[in-house]
Amino acid sequence: MSLKKTLLNIKAFAFDIDGVATDGSVFCSSDGDLLRTYDAKDGFAIRMAVMHGYPVAVITGGSSESIRKRMVTSGVKPDDVYLHCRDKREQFKQFTEKYGLSPEQVMYFGDDVPDVDVLKAAGCGVCPADACLEASEAADLMTDAPGGKGCLREAIEKTLRLQGKWVFDPVQYKAKF
């Protein structure tokens, strides 16, 4: 199937955090919380997807509740933020079943070895420009942007534009967020 047809079939998005939504850097605060930085443009793309009815999930090995807090501010439902994942296939399956989706209808973003099986299972596996070799070989699409620097925005925007849904409605946006 061509990339265009694949993107037209996408009905949901799921992604890893470290190395995808962030650049992979983790800072440890004096109280032991693990802190990350996120690109606001990625957050806006997530909000656009949510605003247009796409389910969005986070499937990460990270375990900090600050991840959930950040993703909820971007519109992700709290119970669609899967933390402390060791076999991401399990949470990917839970997510697809919850929304009645086939794996082929989900775009999954991953950057490292623990993401490879889900990158292969998803309808469109996406990796950032700085992904490891195994992830880049498993992905259907590599973004020009590296992790934490707009890779989510790049592929989500591309998909929504192709589907005619990259449309900003300030009234709807204000009501939702």
Which functions belong to the PLM regions below?
Residues 1-90:
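Alpha-helical substrate-recognition element adjacent to the catalytic core
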Residues 32-36, 74, 78-82, 89-177:
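Mg2+-dependent phosphoryl-transfer enzymes with acidic/Ser/Thr/Gly-rich catalytic loops
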